């Protein structure tokens, strides 16, 4: 029943912290080590004073002065002209990850049903050129939102009754890993709390 399912979720959240800790501790330790290596006074940019929004540009997007938009991928088409990989339909949650060469990787969930979902990645050079596109998760369903971890992985969440959370490598080197300790339900998103060494997960369901 619904009450029984809710009770199981509460029991997991209240009593299953050891499983979550086992998943998170390795990444959190790596994050703390990396954070200690960040030099004091590292640049930080606020978005509070970026200016008023201008009229929509050619892509229909309103941006402040100095910003521009461009289309980098279209569903059903190869992002960089290579026939080897086609950008997915139904894009949803995503995040960006810095690369060592000054560029970045954008990852995007696909909310297709019936094992047609997954996660795609676009890699950009430091000058903004798109240099690679590839899949980092395949054969999953209704990948809605998720969350970036401080140790440079992407948690992709399935949004259906027995949905799972998959930890994905944005660089496409390591295979994605399902994380059963994060529960089986209609997942929405994940947030990593590095101060308290825990994860917060939201559920996309009428009863929350």
What is the predicted role of each segment?
Residues 1-11:
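N-terminal secretory signal peptides
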Residues 6, 26-65, 69:
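C-terminal segment of N-terminal export signals and the immediately downstream linker at the start
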Residues 16-20, 24:
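Sec-dependent signal peptide hydrophobic core
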Residues 57-75, 82-85, 124-137, 168-186:
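Blade-edge beta-strand/turn elements of extracellular beta-propeller
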Residues 62-64, 70-110:
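Beta-strand-rich domains and repeat architectures in extracellular enzymes and scaffolds
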Residues 85-97, 139-151, 184-198:
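Beta-rich, blade/repeat-based domains predominating
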Residues 107-176:
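Well-ordered mid-protein domain cores that form the structural environment of catalytic cofactors
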Residues 152-208:
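Internal, well-ordered domain-core segments that constitute the primary functional module
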């Amino acid at each position: 029943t619904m009450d029984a399912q809710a009770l199981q979720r509460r029991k997991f959240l209240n009593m299953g912290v050891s499983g979550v800790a086992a998943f998170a501790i390795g990444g959190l330790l790596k994050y703390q080590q990396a954070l200690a290596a960040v030099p004091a006074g590292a640049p930080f940019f606020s978005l509070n004073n970026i200016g008023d929004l201008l009229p929509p540009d050619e892509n229909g997007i309103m941006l402040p002065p100095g910003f521009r938009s461009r289309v980098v991928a279209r569903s059903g088409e190869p992002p960089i002209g290579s026939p080897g990989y086609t950008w997915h339909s139904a894009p949803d949650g995503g995040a960006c990850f810095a690369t060592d060469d000054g560029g970045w990787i954008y990852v995007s969930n696909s909310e297709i049903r019936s094992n047609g979902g997954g996660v795609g990645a676009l890699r950009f050079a430091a000058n903004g050129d798109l240099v690679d596109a590839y899949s980092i998760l395949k054969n999953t369903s209704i990948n809605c939102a998720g969350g970036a971890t401080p140790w440079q992985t992407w948690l992709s969440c399935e949004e259906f009754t027995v949905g799972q959370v998959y930890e994905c490598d944005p660089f496409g080197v390591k295979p994605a890993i399902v994380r059963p300790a994060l529960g089986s339900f209609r997942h929405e998103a994940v947030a990593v709390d590095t101060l308290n060494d825990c994860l917060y997960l939201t559920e996309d369901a009428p009863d929350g």
